[in-house]
Amino acid sequence: MRPSLSRLSEEDKRRFHAVYCGLCRALEARCGTAARFILNYDFAFLAVLLSPPQAPEPLHRACMAHPVAGRDYFPLSDALALAADCSVILAWWQLQDAIRDHDAAESVKYRAAAAALGRAYRRAGQARPDFDRATRDHLERLARLEEERCPSIDRAAEEFAALLGAIGRQVEDPVLSRVLEQMLYHLGRWIYLVDAADDLKDDFARGCYNPLIYRFGLTSGALTDEARESLVLSLDHSIRRMAAAYELWDFGVWSSIIQSTVYEGLFLVGKAVLEGTFHAAGRRSGGRDEEKL
């Protein structure tokens, strides 16, 4: 998940890169070197949403990934610290979810990743205990729904939506907190449903739970035309609600990046998933994106 290039000026692209690199440094500063390897565009967009309307001047330094030319980055701030902590907590609990979802042999890579991230998770959890508890509780409820083979996509999506929405409650300003809670709630709902569509073929083949299978009574690992139309309406609803919440706050210099993501980027990703042309690295296991903007 990232902004659509067609809507970004060169200045916006540089600013988004600086957030991406600033979050990478924040992950290391807050949670240790291992935390840097969960960095991806989803978490960078979270950092954008949490950032104040005015951006500081970026700094420039070499780093582990770019030891010669270096990169611009924003220095550690409250927004980057919050994004870093919440990203680590979310990544760690998603790894626990992946371990539970796979057999002993298949879960080895997730166990290894969780072990590497353990120290980072403990630091982040101590800094954000409320979000840590919320993440655990929502994923546990989601696991129970999966075990029950819940046929309601709304009930299943609700847990991940509420989980992301809980990040908004970490923000002190009451108005911004409410705006972010709504934006992140509907973003979480959208992510859950798009992931379900992206995983549908594999889940059906492996006999794994996928809410779309039970909601639409699918007899193969592909959506019927009627099911696809219904899912598109549900995804569009979440994007519209997210956009409505966005309009209630002035995001300043970040407005173009957010608009590009909400009004175009999400539609393009959803379209690619439904057409079978989108191949994402599994979110449940985290994973670092390369800067290709």
Regions found by a protein language model. Give the residues of each.
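Acidic catalytic motifs of isoprenoid enzymes
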Residues: 1-182, 189, 193-220, 224-228, ...
